[in-house]
Amino acid sequence: MTRSVAHMMATGSLGAVFLVVTMDHADGQTRTTARPTLGRIERLDPRLDSIVAPDAKMEIIGNGFDWTEGPLWVKADGGQLLFSDIPPNRILSWQQGRGTQIYLEQSGYLGPIPRPNNIAPDEPGSNALALDPQGRLVLCQHGNRQVARMDAPLSKPKAKYIPIADRYEGKRLNSPNDLVYSKDGSLYFTDPPYGLTRKMEDPDKQLDFQGVYRVGKDGQVALLTKELSRPNGIAFSPDQKTLYVANSDAARAIWMAYDVKPDGTIANGRVFFDATSWVGPEKKGLPDGMKVDTQGHLFATGPGGVHVFDKDAKHLGTFVTGEATSNCAFGEDGSTLFITADMYVLRLRLKVKGTGF
């Protein structure tokens, strides 16, 4: 979701900030430090206790950014978290004991910023990040209006890109937002208008819809659905028989579920959960990025924070951040959830593991 939309939804935030003791490991040394924390955990079902401990806190591991998105855990070289900061057009990295550093400039747009005639704040940078089956960095690029692969090793990042998807039936995509790979190597992604300088009114908008797409191993871009007004976050169930898609529209703030057919297309679209009634000044944000654990729980960012659902759409609880919350990702040993929430990057220890670990 775009930062400007998120900030229109509400003002104010949770003021309580606590301290939690953590263990940092740097240069072989172990030391105890205190980290500030943010928000609270709202428990709506006793089953949430098997997912997150009663005393768990959301640690602030980074702050002061413009609009964070697209967290991705990279296991190589001791492990690091990559995440996008969209308005300044960059990716940052975080490592335990090292903190946050700039990883890549011009991550979503190779031209000058701010772009002319933009509706402030301009959001030209990368959004969601992923690793392809070969372990290469793949980016949803707002300004370049494409899904692209970085043409450089992860250890030596460069603003050099190879397009994977930039057009559909000869027309330029809007601004790819989120993506996920299937087990067979196919790429699924969403394409709302948030990265366009004038959003829906942009004169350079060539498609008259916002789509969900699949790129098969043959490289062809196939439209899966154009029924959603603002398709955004996207994730698979553990068995990849269900595809979840968030719709970041205040008038229809929903998460959809689709059956995935053997040929990779989708069918039987239905509303998984409707959060439209949550939208308002008390809860910042809209349905956005999401991830799934190995037990099938859906961790879906949306109004108020990160909402935890079981596979039957039962709402178990919410990690209430008090900020517009854009995305999340599992990392470290798989039982840590990293959360991007406006200017913050948060870390929450869980009792479950995400898929892929």
Go through each PLM region and give its residues.
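Sequence-structural signature of mature extracellular/luminal beta-sheet repeat domains
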Residues: Q29-F357
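Generic cytosolic/nucleocytoplasmic N-terminal low-complexity/intrinsically disordered segments
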Residues: H7-M8, V260
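N-terminal secretory signal peptides that target proteins for export/translocation
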Residues: M1-A6
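Signal peptide processing junction and immediate N-terminal pro/mature segment
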Residues: V21-T30
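Bacterial N-terminal signal peptides
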Residues: A10-V21
